């Protein structure tokens, strides 16, 4: 029995460290348009160059989702397929994936495909991909994996910490005044992905130290009790290490991974940003 785990580049993994038996992981890239340049978010992307270009232009940058054809190509070669997308509130990737699924099943009726809207990005998507791999590795049937991953998604959340908000300002999602204040006063925006997949501000913390404590407080308030965490970060390892230490003071057995953000997640998190997925009880 052949399996595929597919994720768009709202997931930070380019490949899985230890794929389950008979399982292939495929990353399907979104593209990021900065002025007249288009950056494809695959393993060859120079994220530093993309970010430099983005900050050098006054125009709003934007992302474009994979086409149904991109997903159709990714489906080939497996009988059991799971596909995880970035939240449908930020991208059309989920709609594109659903369309591709319907087209593919017309010609391949014996294939099983389950598409998951993560309602999130970054670390929480990474957790869902890791869990799918674990469930397949346990030898479960397709239907059992669907049931288990659906239940698991109810127990995962996303917390974000943003040190820069240039993109939000350029795209009109945040006022220029707030953007200026964030930059001048060293403010960090601490927020979460809501139940419907929108980004929701929780706190404003001044400086790195206070943002670490604010992130920890929100984590515990949301129900974290020592489970798995994936910190997807854009040039922010110091903050991640400090937050990891703070978490382990209370939960010494916490399983914490730190990953660099994909191009798309770097686009949203910006420099110094963190998109942290975590499990709750």
UniProtKB/Swiss-Prot annotation:
This protein's name: DegV domain-containing protein spr0652
Function as written in the Swiss-Prot or TrEMBL entry: May bind long-chain fatty acids, such as palmitate, and may play a role in lipid transport or fatty acid metabolism.
Molecular-function annotations in GO: lipid binding
Residues that coordinate or bind hexadecanoate: 63, 91
Electron transport listed as a keyword: no
Keywords, in A-Z order: Lipid-binding
Occurrences of domain DegV (ranges): 3-280
NCBIfam families (alphabetical): DegV (TIGR00762)
UniProt organism field: Streptococcus pneumoniae (strain ATCC BAA-255 / R6)
Key word Phosphoprotein present: no
Annotated InterPro entries: DegV, DegV_C, DegV_domain_contain
